[in-house]
């Protein structure tokens, strides 16, 4: 392998390609003369669009083929949305870099209404996320929530075709695809706690590839890593897959981190919440401690029921 060449495995969706192009541009900016190649690939998660993710294996479906490419030395790195990255990595691979986070909030998207509170009784909202479903149903049990799969463009087209009165998407994806004008309003973390890692981009590579790790190192954003570590640690302790009604959101003020978390029944009938504050350098411990608090309040009963249905 040439010392100044990196191959990036990426999904083919516009958002995945944006993320890969972002990393490519950053590497080229930091390392003049480097040759960065993109290897677009289809994953099972991109192909199976007619079934809710929870029923076909969760969001790990979006990364497996990329990981195989790295293990087979067809690619050097893979670029992921952190909210799609499973807790465990295949032997020989690891998460080397977490880039600076984009806006982590959910976005309310509608051609007719400005916010969830403006929606009329019985309006139809599109989202496949159990996390979003439980929080919307808790505040607006009258709303009809329908599954929504596909890439961002497909989801917006379904809204424009009148299949939904509104849809909920990650704000970061719309911002990155220069579709901010489609956002009717940003949903505050208080109203809809984001998914762990939402808005952050991670780079996975072979853990023994020191050449690639050295090239990637300048892309690391330490504050984002602390935040995402706390959120993922909470999710891991809860034994949460990617398609679960779990919200986690960490914020940092100076050296102090505040982590909020929730587990909700997808029907909105019960939401268990907690908050913890401590040193940002103890991000993982804070995540585990908050998970323990949620479990002590009954989170396991909710999660067991969700897994039983999946």
UniProtKB/Swiss-Prot annotation:
Q: GO CC: one term? A: cytoplasm
Q: Which cofactor does it need?
A: dipyrromethane
InterPro entries assigned: HemC, Porphobilin_deaminase_cofac_BS, Porphobilin_deaminase_N, Porphobilinogen_deaminase_C, Porphobilinogen_deaminase_C_sf
Which UniProt keywords are present, listed alphabetically? Porphyrin biosynthesis, Transferase
Catalytic activity as recorded in UniProt: 4 porphobilinogen + H2O = hydroxymethylbilane + 4 NH4(+)
Q: Where is the signal peptide?
A: none
Tell me the Pfam families matching this sequence: Porphobil_deam (PF01379), Porphobil_deamC (PF03900)
Cofactor mode of binding and number, as noted: Binds 1 dipyrromethane group covalently.
Q: Which PROSITE patterns match?
A: PORPHOBILINOGEN_DEAM
Outline what the protein does: Tetrapolymerization of the monopyrrole PBG into the hydroxymethylbilane pre-uroporphyrinogen in several discrete steps.
User: What does the record's miscellaneous section state?
Assistant: The porphobilinogen subunits are added to the dipyrromethane group.
Name of the protein? Porphobilinogen deaminase
Source species, please? Shewanella baltica (strain OS155 / ATCC BAA-1091)
Gene name for this UniProt entry: hemC
């Amino acid at each position: 392998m040439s010392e100044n060449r990196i191959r990036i495995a990426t999904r083919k969706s516009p958002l995945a390609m944006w993320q890969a192009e972002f990393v490519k541009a950053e590497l080229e900016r930091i390392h003049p003369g480097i040759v960065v190649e993109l290897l677009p690939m289809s994953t099972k998660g991109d192909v199976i669009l007619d079934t809710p993710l929870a029923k076909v294996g969760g969001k790990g479906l979006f990364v497996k083929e990329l990981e195989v490419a790295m293990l087979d030395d067809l690619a050097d790195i893979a670029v992921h949305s952190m909210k799609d990255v499973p807790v465990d990595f295949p032997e020989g691979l690891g998460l080397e870099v977490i880039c600076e986070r984009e806006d982590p909030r959910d976005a309310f998207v509608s051609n007719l209404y400005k916010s969830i509170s403006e929606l009329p009784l019985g309006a139809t909202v599109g989202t496949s996320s159990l996390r979003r479903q439980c929080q919307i149903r808790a505040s607006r049990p009258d709303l009809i929530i329908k599954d929504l799969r596909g890439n961002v463009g497909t989801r917006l087209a379904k809204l424009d075709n009148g299949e939904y009165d509104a849809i909920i998407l990650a704000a970061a994806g719309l911002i990155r695809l220069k579709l901010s004008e489609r956002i009717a309003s940003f949903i505050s973390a208080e109203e809809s706690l984001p998914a762990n890692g939402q808005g952050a981009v991670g780079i996975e590579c072979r853990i023994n590839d020191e050449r690639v790790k050295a090239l990637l190192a300048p892309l690391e954003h330490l504050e984002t890593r602390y935040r995402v570590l706390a959120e993922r640690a909470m999710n891991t302790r809860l034994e949460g897959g990617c398609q679960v009604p779990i919200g986690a959101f960490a914020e940092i003020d100076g050296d102090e981190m505040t982590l909020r978390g929730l587990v909700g029944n997808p029907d909105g009938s019960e939401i268990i919440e907690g908050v913890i504050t401590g040193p940002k350098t103890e991000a993982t411990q804070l995540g585990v401690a908050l998970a323990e608090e949620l479990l002590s309040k009954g989170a396991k009963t909710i999660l067991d029921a969700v897994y039983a249905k999946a």
